[in-house]
Amino acid sequence: EKEQSFLIQEGFRILDTYGNHPSFVMFSLGNELWGDKNRMNDIIKGYKSVDTRHLYTQGSNNFQWYPCIVEEDDFFSGVRFSIERQIRGSYAMCDKPLGHVQTMRPSANMNYDNSILPNNKVKSNTSAIDENGYIKIQYGTGVKLIKADELENEFIPHVPVVSHEIGQYETFPNFKEIDKYTGVLKARNFEVFKKRLEDKGMLSLADKFFQASGKLAVECYKTELESAVRSKYLAGFQLLDIQDFTGQG
């Protein structure tokens, strides 16, 4: 309760400090949250009572396979509406099924309109729930068991939809960058990767791997972005930009 109170007050401090910033348009309570939906709704309501200029949402990709929209949500941010109704192009193996960028040939017709507003009934992910009512969810880089709520057969959004963390296509390391790390930060990971490749007798192919993986990443991003822009029912997307180490998507 003390931690929750601090986080809620931190939200008010964000509004007070950055509320006038011209780029402060949308406010999400957090990333991939689980918890009390009613409590999240009340928190948003409290923020709106102070500052109504922004668009608010309960979180980004909350409840993963079992998304919902609460009363105070101004938009929805997620990756799917059910196991089959996907709204981005790729998924991790722990978050299957995989997306169209991973499993299909590029298409000039691919879009997410039928996933957002389906013409036909679709399956929900009830098969993933075990006999005790638990389901495995993605948790960090692993999995975690949580109690699954009873699911509705179909979830139709009534607010603008934003696709969450699209992209994430990686490239092979460019070992020529190792010498550029002249400060306190060293490219130890690159050194390990280079040694592994050398041990396998493939170091001479490093540049080709770098070029080929870069070209593949460009094609994947092209397919992903064009599918999103082509979707008339998709209000926008969040392009993940993680650069913890060079080459990460």
Residue ranges and their predicted role:
Residues 1-75, 79, 156, 237:
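Active-site mouth of glycoside hydrolases
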Residues 27, 89-249:
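Substrate-binding clefts and catalytic carboxylate motifs of secreted carbohydrate-active enzymes
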Residues 76-89:
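Acidic, His- and aromatic-enriched active-site or binding-groove loops in soluble protein domains
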